């Protein structure tokens, strides 16, 4: 909190509210005419993604983005298979035995 002159007066309390800095007005005819060449120049030099600090090559195993959008007929069959075939690779079908936990003797040692 910021101290103000009002804080020094006993019995009075005043809170100072921070405000934002004024923003530039976009839309005036003179600034729009002047900024058009600058904005087109910025668009050419604008950073478009990746890591500008340490550029690394794409690994061979990584799929391209286009492969996710264009599925082959073979892949689309896998997507639309019957619900009984889909699932957790058969783990749910096998019955699992309940394994009780061994008794915890840490409480006995503390006493």
Curated annotation (Swiss-Prot):
Please provide the record's keywords in A-Z order.
Acetylation, Cytoplasm, DNA damage, DNA repair, Isopeptide bond, Nucleus, Phosphoprotein, Ubl conjugation
Location of motif PIP-box in this chain is 62-72
Question: Where is the sequence biased in composition, kind Polar residues?
Answer: 1-10, 27-39
Biological processes, Gene Ontology terms: centrosome cycle; DNA damage response; DNA replication; regulation of cell cycle; response to UV; translesion synthesis
Task: Give the modified residues of type N6-acetyllysine.
Answer: 24
Chain span(s) of sequence motif KEN box: 78-80
Location relative to the cell: Nucleus; Cytoplasm, Perinuclear region
Biased segments, Basic and acidic residues type: 74-84
In the UniProt record, the signal sequence range is none
A GO term from the CC aspect: perinuclear region of cytoplasm
Chain span(s) of sequence motif Initiation motif: 85-97
Output the InterPro entries linked to this UniProt entry: PCNA-AF, PCNA-AF_dom
Q: How does it assemble?
A: Interacts (when monoubiquitinated at Lys-15 and Lys-24) with PCNA. Interacts with isoform 2/p33ING1b of ING1. Interacts with BRCA1.
Provide the function of this protein: PCNA-binding protein that acts as a regulator of DNA repair during DNA replication. Following DNA damage, the interaction with PCNA is disrupted, facilitating the interaction between monoubiquitinated PCNA and the translesion DNA synthesis DNA polymerase eta (POLH) at stalled replisomes, facilitating the bypass of replication-fork-blocking lesions. Also acts as a regulator of centrosome number.
What domain comment accompanies this record?
The PIP-box mediates the interaction with PCNA.
This chain belongs to the protein called: PCNA-associated factor
Source organism of this protein record: Bos taurus
């Amino acid at each position: 909190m910021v101290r103000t002159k009002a804080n020094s007066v006993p019995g009075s309390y005043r809170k100072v509210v921070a405000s934002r800095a004024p923003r530039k007005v976009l839309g005036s005819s003179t600034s729009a005419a002047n900024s058009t060449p600058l904005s087109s120049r910025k668009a050419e030099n604008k950073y478009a993604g990746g890591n500008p600090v340490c550029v690394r090559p794409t690994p061979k195993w990584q799929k391209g983005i286009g492969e996710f959008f264009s599925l082959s007929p073979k892949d689309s069959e896998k997507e639309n298979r019957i619900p009984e075939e889909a699932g957790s690779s058969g783990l749910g079908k096998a019955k699992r035995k309940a394994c009780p936990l061994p008794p915890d003797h840490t409480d006995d040692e503390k006493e």
